[in-house]
Design a protein with these regions (language model features):
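Short secondary-structure boundary/capping segments
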Residues: 1-2, 327-328, 379, 415-417, ...
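Short, small/polar-rich motifs associated with maturation and membrane association
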Residues: 1-516, 521-523, 528-530, 609
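Flexible hinge/switch segments at interdomain interfaces of large molecular machines
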Residues: 242-249, 454-461, 585-589, 646-648, ...
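Short, surface-exposed recognition loops and adjoining beta-strand edges that mediate ligand/DNA contacts
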Residues: 284, 292-295, 545, 785-797
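Extracellular/periplasmic, surface-exposed regions of secreted and cell-surface proteins
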Residues: 308, 512, 518-527, 532-537, ...
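Surface-exposed acidic, glycine/proline-enriched linker/cap segments
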Residues: 328-349, 460, 562-576, 718-728, ...
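A surface-exposed, glycine/aromatic-enriched loop/edge motif typical of exported proteins
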Residues: 413-447, 536-582, 639, 796-825, ...
């Protein structure tokens, strides 16, 4: 019996002890071995929390000692939200979490120490940690431990708020010169004991300015933290849509955000950048709300070809064809004119279909090194546009914008008003010598008269304000509404906008409707997708003529005699036969009011572009991405180049009525498919970031056009009404295959070295010359942390770069290929086949090459109130593709050769000063 009682006592003791050990093991997260089963593998809790921070882009604050040695066995790829992950990870650990902000969480023990009241004079528990130890990475607390200390004579408390006045959790409060400190709670409250009135409290948080406050006779100290803009890690969207830290870039870039674009809203989003970016020239052609923006980055690189930068939206290139700059029939060219010669109008460009309110950021990659990963298409720089994909804050938001602008014609003329209309010192006294253009007549005298082209005698006196008298004030009215959502998993943005414009030319109107959808979601911690789709419809009626062209409104007005009354031209634009009344002996000057009423051009364009990208993280430092994007537009237009009855046209044959009418249908499609593999890992103070990818670009464009003349019925502009018809069908296809890669090495997050390489294979060149390889190398050094500048220098960086790119952009899809067609000219009554075109193919034609070197530096001073960005660059373009005339005996007229060479060099400087900056007002110059 005694033995039985002894065994029972021993057994109970063992069971009780085992039970206690099991509880301790569960609380600590350690494994328990059971008979017949293998031990379970647990993950370190602190590593799991670090992974959550990176995956969900949140901050999780905790004391190291409370998570030290704790384990978890949860599968890290199975969480759909931060809250779900923390709930699972903290099970059985004796810890809990509190959500202290939008993306901020605090982990603490379930039974926290009692917090003393402000009036308590008893011994209290305070946090003690080294004075040099701050929050690591903006989230975790290191070296904080609870220690029992002696009674303090003064007890201080208060509330800490952020820049918006909200409670700020996780702020370090340190008693200067000691290891005594505290941390603000979820509401921003804190309590700390100090030694005397001379004690100094230091309030600190990563990304915010440290504040030191002398206690004095205060018992409550409230503090508002200020953002340290000098330490903000600016992220820049670079080539291929890769996001990189701005300080790591060894080349010049400029980024403009949506709030800067909205200050000066313009129908064409690029015009809002005028004067904002150094080294970039942006000029509107003054051709109305649907007009083209001429963009040049660091000058011209091609002598005879196109010099437009590549436009990239959300990582995928889109077409930016300019309609109206130069005549041509190739829809894949950078600029397209109208058939019939002369009277070219500005029909807009690809950027005009983008609603400025949909743009989140615009980044300009200026040099060859910045754009090298885009290869041949980026020889003139790249403009990266990122559109909105979610709400700014969590939840659902609706934004409505109403924008109105007024445009007035710019009258920069400075005419003389001493002598009037006429020639050789004689004013018009009969209709015949009326010049209508020259003001070389007699000197103005009171009571003098002149005879105009209509035979009417009017006063011989100055006519002022011709420009403002003819043109009107333009108006632009934009209504846009956006529905956006945002959550822990992602968000979306859906917008609709309607732009109605009236140009300064009385018969010019423009309407644009756009729908934009952007979205980005994390399906799991490892798998995410994002996409963007944009649809636009444009109606452009009678876009103004551009340039120095005969028979156009601008030329007629600016060359008009200074005593020609506008009302006479308006009321007498037709003669007795219904033709234009000749007001000038110069036949290339058309009455501007005749042009308004009898010449027309109608343009309709529908466009849809977008892309979708899928990204999967194989590990926390390695991901793969696949993306496909498409840009498609259709453009229909009809116009009459020379209205029937125009005085500048030769007399029509008997039975015919003169004039030219054209109908055109253009279709364009470009598909880009690419993949990208990225590895980004740190080895102590050394960081490695490697990218490898490839792209396939396929482009197709076609043109259906018919031009008719010799109308049966005058002023009836239809294809059926023209006796002579000239149809055209033009098809262009081209493709480029590419492989590319980049590698970046960083040391101490201060020294950066980056190299890139890309190889393109062009379909437009011969097999021997279609492959071209172009490299780039860049370096930067962030030096301000190594200098003792007593706080006046917030940021300093030196950078240098060199790159080479090539291009086949000046080679037409088939201009270097011999092909045959059926000629319109008949021989013996039969159509004849033969070589199509007058350009002799050159099998040795090579892509043009551009080598560019640049050095520069960036400075930010006095709490970012003064910033300076300077760059020096030299760009050498060789093997330019030009057209050379050859002997007619060859059967051709010209051939393309590599001959041209040009050099661009310059200095760029952007100085930004913020003289006044308050909570409600900022003045930046």
């Amino acid at each position: 019996m005694k033995k039985l009682l002894l065994f029972m006592c021993i057994g109970c003791s063992v069971l009780w002890q085992a039970n206690a050990q099991v509880k301790d093991l569960i609380a600590s997260g350690q494994t328990i071995n059971t008979a017949g089963k293998a031990s379970t593998t647990f993950l370190d809790l602190q590593q799991s929390l670090n992974w959550l921070e990176q995956e969900f882009q949140v901050s999780i604050a905790y004391q190291d000692e409370i998570v030290k040695a704790k384990k978890t066995r949860a599968k890290m790829d199975s969480f759909e939200s931060v809250e779900q992950a923390l709930t699972v990870l903290l099970q059985g650990t004796g810890l809990k979490y509190d959500k202290a902000g939008e993306r901020f969480y605090i982990i603490s023990q379930k039974k926290p120490s009692q917090v003393p009241s402000l009036n308590s004079q008893e011994t209290v528990l305070v946090n003690s940690f080294p004075a040099s130890n701050k929050i690591n990475g903006g989230s975790t607390f290191s070296g904080i431990e609870n220690a029992k200390v002696e009674k303090r004579r003064i007890e201080i408390g208060g509330r800490i708020t952020d820049e918006n006045g909200s409670g700020f959790p996780g702020v370090n409060i340190l008693l200067k010169g000691t290891t005594t400190g505290a941390v603000s709670d979820a509401q921003g409250n804190y309590v700390i004991n100090v030694e005397n009135e001379n004690s100094v409290l230091v309030f600190s948080f990563v990304g915010y300015v440290d504040q030191e406050i002398v206690v004095g006779n205060q018992s409550v100290i409230n503090v508002q933290m200020e953002v340290d803009e000098s330490n903000l890690e600016e992220v820049v969207v670079t080539a291929l849509g890769i996001e990189k830290s701005a300080k790591s870039l060894g080349y010049a870039t400029s980024t403009v955000h949506s709030d800067e674009l909205s200050i000066n809203r313009t129908p064409n989003v690029m015009n809002a950048l005028q004067g904002k970016v150094a080294g970039v020239s942006i000029s509107a052609l003054g051709s109305g709300p649907g007009g083209t923006s001429k963009i040049r980055i660091r000058g011209q690189s091609s002598i005879s070809g196109q010099n437009n930068p590549l436009i990239v939206v959300n990582g995928v290139p889109i077409d930016n064809t300019n309609f109206g700059s130069n005549p041509g029939n190739n829809a894949s060219d950078s600029s397209i004119g109208v058939r019939g010669g002369g009277n070219t109008s500005d029909g807009g460009d690809g950027l005009s279909s983008i609603n400025p309110d949909d743009v989140e950021t615009m980044t300009i990659l200026k040099g060859a090194a910045a754009a090298a990963l885009y290869g041949s298409r980026a020889k003139d720089g790249v403009i990266m546009i990122t559109t909105k994909s979610k709400n700014d804050s969590k939840g659902i938001g609706v934004t409505y914008n109403l924008n109105y602008t007024n445009e007035a014609p710019l009258d920069f003329t400075d005419y003389q008003y001493e002598y009037g209309q006429g020639e050789q010192g004689v004013r018009p006294t009969t209709p015949n010598p009326t010049s209508g253009q020259w003001s070389f007549g007699e000197k103005f005298q009171p009571g003098m008269t002149q005879v105009l082209f209509d035979g009417v005698t009017v006063p011989y006196e100055p006519v002022r304000g011709i420009i403002n008298g003819f043109f009107r004030n333009g108006q632009n009215l934009t209504n846009s509404i956006t529905l956006a959502t945002s959550s822990d998993k992602g968000g979306m943005s859906l917008s609709f906008s309607d732009l109605n414009s009236k140009g300064i030319v009385p018969n010019n109107t423009y309407n644009r409707k756009t729908i934009n959808l952007g979205f980005a979601y994390n399906l799991s911690p490892k798998f995410s997708f994002r996409g963007n789709f944009n649809y636009s419809h444009e109606d452009n009626e009678n876009p103004p003529n551009i340039g120095q062209q005969d028979n156009t409104i601008p030329v007629a007005l600016y060359n008009m005699a200074n005593s020609m009354p506008l009302d006479v031209l308006r009321e007498n634009r037709y003669d007795e036969n219904g033709n234009e009344a000749v007001y000038s002996r110069f036949r290339n000057r058309t009455n501007p009011y005749f042009t308004l009423s009898d010449q027309f051009q109608n343009i309709k364009r529908d466009r849809i572009f977008g892309n979708i990208a899928l990204k999967y993280y194989l590990t926390d430092w390695l991901f793969v991405q696949g993306r496909v994007g498409q840009d498609y537009w259709s453009r229909d237009q009809d116009y009459n180049n020379f209205p029937t009855g125009q005085a500048s046209r030769a007399p029509a044959p008997a039975g015919f009525v003169n004039g030219v009418y054209t109908q055109e249908q253009r279709r364009f499609r470009e598909i880009n498919t690419d993949f990208l593999i990225n590895a980004n890992k740190k080895f102590g103070e050394l960081g490695v970031n490697v990218n490898f990818g490839g792209n396939h670009m396929q482009r197709r464009s076609d043109l259906n056009s018919v031009q008719v003349t010799d109308f049966v019925v005058r002023d009836l502009y239809t294809v059926q009404n023209g006796r002579a018809k000239d149809p055209i069908y033009d098809l262009n296809e081209r493709a480029v295959n590419s492989l590319y890669g980049s590698a970046e090495l960083s040391f101490q997050d201060k020294f950066f070295l980056t190299g890139t390489v890309r190889n393109d294979w062009f379909s437009t060149l011969s097999k021997e010359n279609r492959s071209i390889l172009y490299p780039s190398v860049s370096a930067s050094w962030v030096f301000h942390e190594n200098l003792n500048t007593t706080g006046w220098l917030n940021f300093g960086k030196i950078r240098a770069a060199y790159a080479e790119v090539g291009s086949d952009a000046d080679v037409g899809a088939y201009s270097n290929v011999l092909f045959y067609g059926i000629n319109n000219n008949l021989f013996g009554g039969q159509p004849v086949g033969g070589p199509n075109g007058t350009n002799l193919p050159n099998p040795n034609l090579r892509p043009m090459r551009i080598g560019e070197a640049e050095i520069g530096f960036e400075l930010s001073m006095f709490q970012s109130r003064v910033s300076l960005d300077m760059a020096l660059y030299r760009k050498l373009t060789t093997d330019q593709i030009v057209s050379a005339q050859i002997s007619d005996a060859s059967g051709f007229v010209n051939t393309s050769i590599n001959s041209g060479k040009s050099e661009n060099k310059g200095v760029e400087m952007l100085l930004t000063v913020v003289p006044v900056e308050t909570k409600d007002f900022t003045w930046e110059a």
